Amino acid sequence: MEIKITEVKENKLIGRKEIYFEIYHPGEPTPSRKDVKGKLVAMLDLNPETTVIQYIRSYFGSYKSKGYAKYYYDKDRMLYIEPEYILIRDGIIEKKEGE
């Protein structure tokens, strides 16, 4: 799996970086969010606790996927802005009992 950063935008109003990327994975299925997040964090020297993978989109018959991630400068702001289901999906918070 190879990740290429296509665009990085700084959103100063919200306090985050928005990262667009392409993943090349010839002969392999779409990589997991956990694998992609780990590689992005290592490539860009980010904090995994404040990095969220918004989406990874694969195209039928292609070995290339596109994705979008957000890196927040402050964890409290991330918890305030990001929807709960995204935080659960990325393993940042635990699902509440009974839901």
Curated annotation (Swiss-Prot):
> Per UniProt, which keywords does this protein have?
Ribonucleoprotein, Ribosomal protein
InterPro entries from the entry? Nucleotide-bd_a/b_plait_sf, Ribosomal_eS24, Ribosomal_eS24_CS, Ribosomal_uL23/eL15/eS24_sf
What Pfam families does the record point to?
A: Ribosomal_S24e
Q: Which domain of life is it from?
A: Archaea
One GO molecular function term of this record is: structural constituent of ribosome
Biological process GO terms, please?
translation
Which family is annotated? Answer: Belongs to the eukaryotic ribosomal protein eS24 family.
HAMAP family annotated for this entry? Answer: Ribosomal_eS24
- Please give the PANTHER family that the UniProt record associates with this protein: 40S RIBOSOMAL PROTEIN S24 (PTHR10496)
From the Swiss-Prot or TrEMBL record, give the protein name: Small ribosomal subunit protein eS24
Q: Which organism is this entry from?
A: Pyrococcus abyssi (strain GE5 / Orsay)
